[in-house]
Amino acid sequence: NESFIKLAQDFAELALNFDSKEDFLAADFNGITVAEKLIEQTGVIGEKIEIRSFERLNGAFIGSYIHAGNKIATLVALSANVEGADEVAKNVSMQAAAMAPIALNEAGVDADTIAKEIEIAKDLLRQEGKPEAILDNIAKGKLARFFKDNTLVNQDYIKDNKLSVADYVKSLDKNLIVTGFKRAALEIGR
């Protein structure tokens, strides 16, 4: 629906001025608050509209990608605005859309997820009959593979799998790094 897309674009533009969801929802939007506009539009289109999350991404250069069909959108922050940053940021944003990483790097993976992955690896190794004495070392290797598959900068770059995403970014400028990313997917019926 064209009017919904326009509303979403207007909200996105307005959201740039706020640091929290609460402040954004309380903001003026043509004489009413954003929260009131959401309720009004829910009545118009017959579907509940809500802002589920609100995060600010900071960086010297922010690139974006919206996947065909407008169901997935990503933002990527780079450490510098160098020539070619727009193309690199878009390509890394496409990577984040396609590969759905859970974190930027190892440091961004929560401790519970790490513990769970180690335990899964150990359980599988036990089922294979591996001795307890070597489980920790093999599980560490499996955890490294988990990080490679599930953290953005460590993933194989989808356009050249000989490079990690971090290496691809550094191919533009040796000091350039990805400092953050956000991935949002449309959830219907929740």
What are these language model-derived features?
Residues 1-190:
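N-terminal assembly/interaction segments in proteins that build large macromolecular machines
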